[in-house]
UniProtKB/Swiss-Prot annotation:
Protein name: Ribosome-binding factor A
Originating species: Clavibacter michiganensis subsp. michiganensis (strain NCPPB 382)
Keyword Transport: no
GO terms (BP aspect): maturation of SSU-rRNA
GO cellular component, one term: cytosol
Assembly with partners or alone: Monomer. Binds 30S ribosomal subunits, but not 50S ribosomal subunits or 70S ribosomes.
Record's keyword terms, sorted: Cytoplasm, Ribosome biogenesis
Family membership noted in the UniProt record: Belongs to the RbfA family.
Function text: One of several proteins that assist in the late maturation steps of the functional core of the 30S ribosomal subunit. Associates with free 30S ribosomal subunits (but not with 30S subunits that are part of 70S ribosomes or polysomes). Required for efficient processing of 16S rRNA. May interact with the 5'-terminal helix region of 16S rRNA.
Coiled coil: none
Ranges where the record places region Disordered: 119-166
Domain of life (superkingdom): Bacteria
Length: 166
């Protein structure tokens, strides 16, 4: 049976332990500016996926990935010392795609703003296809129209072939 609350608590604890150790405990020069963004632990608490971002170039990201791979054993033993679980979960470091996704979303939003500005410019210089006011107005009865019919149905009863309904 999976206890999601326990897995979430363990993930939060692992995130804190690993982030602290990366900040203060690892002296590898290949390790760049790393931010632990998320940790996900499986339901059986046997495996932890640690998502991280690196500020820098692609080369610095590759160097940081190599440094994390070499430090995985030390980080796992540190996690094992600081959590209260029977078994220490295995650790896997995954480069998080958040910065790339954020840049792609920013580019899409900028494209949408540009297109909105183009549409607004076209709307200002455009002309209406019909009347300026497309809504139907109530009919105003003029003096030249037949107003003298008492029953108001505007039927010419003197026309040839007219027969009243029975």
């Amino acid at each position: 049976m999976v206890d999601h609350a326990r897995a979430r608590k363990m993930a939060d604890r692992i995130k804190e332990i690993v982030a602290r150790k990366l900040d203060r405990g690892i002296k590898d020069p290949r390790l760049g500016f790393v931010t632990v963004t998320d940790v996900r632990v499986t339901g059986d608490l046997q495996h932890a996926s640690i998502f991280y971002t690196v500020y820098g170039t692609d080369e610095e990201r590759a160097d940081t990935a190599a440094a994390l791979k070499s430090a995985t054993g030390m980080l796992r033993s540190e996690v094992g010392k600081n959590i209260t679980a029977r078994l220490t979960p295995s650790l896997e470091f995954i480069l998080d795609g958040v910065p790339e996704n954020a840049a792609a979303i920013d580019a899409l939003l900028e494209e949408a703003r540009r297109r909105d500005a183009d549409v607004q410019a076209q709307a200002k210089s455009g002309v209406y296809a019909g009347d300026e006011d497309p809504y139907v107005k109530p009919r105003v009865i003029g003096e030249d129209e037949d107003e003298d019919d008492e029953d108001g149905d505007d039927i010419d009863r003197s026309a040839p072939g007219y027969e009243p309904a029975h």
